[in-house]
Amino acid sequence: MFPMVTEFMNYGQQTVRAARYIGQGFMITLSHANRLPVTIQYPYEKLITSERFRGRIHFEFDKCIACEVCVRVCPIDLPVVDWKLETDIRKKRLLNYSIDFGICIFCGNCVEYCPTNCLSMTEEYELSTYDRHELNYNQIALGRLPMSIIDDYTIRTILNLPEIKI
């Protein structure tokens, strides 16, 4: 008779423990009900990226001295720097500068080690195209300002999502 009573007590303890675990899970679910939604309507609303975000590289042609430091520090030797030596002034003159963003790993080494600060990272991350050859940006495409600076009126940036009224 005693084994039957102990089994019944164990069953009761297990039932109480299971109910407690279900209650804890339900409390976690209820705590998430008060939070703001994480999703946004992407093409029309965009979250503001952090200031350390590594997006598309912006290039200023006039500042570049064609030292090729960006090529040496790049782990995949990506930037293509074409220059010509001016013999009369004994300086390099930059002819072309290009980066293929289809291969770029956005490590930021080129920006960090550039002695003249002609390279900078922007917050632009929409680089998708249907043709991979369009991702090869030359000095003209790299010099264009990103959309966030131009201030496109059709896109609303979101710093804090609106609160839910219950």
UniProtKB/Swiss-Prot annotation:
Give the main localization category.
plastid
Which free-text remark accompanies the cofactor? Binds 2 [4Fe-4S] clusters per subunit.
Q: Name one Pfam family in it.
A: Fer4
- EC number(s) on record? 7.1.1.-
Keywords of this entry: 4Fe-4S, Chloroplast, Iron, Iron-sulfur, Membrane, Metal-binding, NAD, NADP, Plastid, Plastoquinone, Quinone, Repeat, Thylakoid, Translocase
The record's subcellular locations are:
Plastid, Chloroplast thylakoid membrane
- Give the CC-aspect GO terms: chloroplast thylakoid membrane
Bilayer topology reads: Peripheral membrane protein
Q: What class of enzyme is it?
A: translocase
Under the heading InterPro entries, the entry gives: 4Fe4S_Fe-S-bd, 4Fe4S_Fe_S_CS, NADH_quinone_OxRdtase_chainI, NDHI
**Essential cofactor(s):** [4Fe-4S] cluster
Residues noted as binding [4Fe-4S] cluster 2 in the record, renumbered to the chain: 74, 104, 107, 110
Q: Does the entry feature the keyword Chaperone, yes or no? A: no
Query: Single GO molecular-function term?
Result: 4 iron, 4 sulfur cluster binding
Which residues take part in binding [4Fe-4S] cluster 1? Answer: 64, 67, 70, 114
Give a short account of what the protein does: NDH shuttles electrons from NAD(P)H:plastoquinone, via FMN and iron-sulfur (Fe-S) centers, to quinones in the photosynthetic chain and possibly in a chloroplast respiratory chain. The immediate electron acceptor for the enzyme in this species is believed to be plastoquinone. Couples the redox reaction to proton translocation, and thus conserves the redox energy in a proton gradient.
Instruction: Family membership, please give it.
Output: Belongs to the complex I 23 kDa subunit family.
- Assembly, per entry: NDH is composed of at least 16 different subunits, 5 of which are encoded in the nucleus.
Q: Which NCBIfam families match?
A: ndhI, NuoI, PRK05888.1-3
Q: What is this protein called?
A: NAD(P)H-quinone oxidoreductase subunit I, chloroplastic
Q: Which organism is it from?
A: Espeletia timotensis (Andean giant rosette)
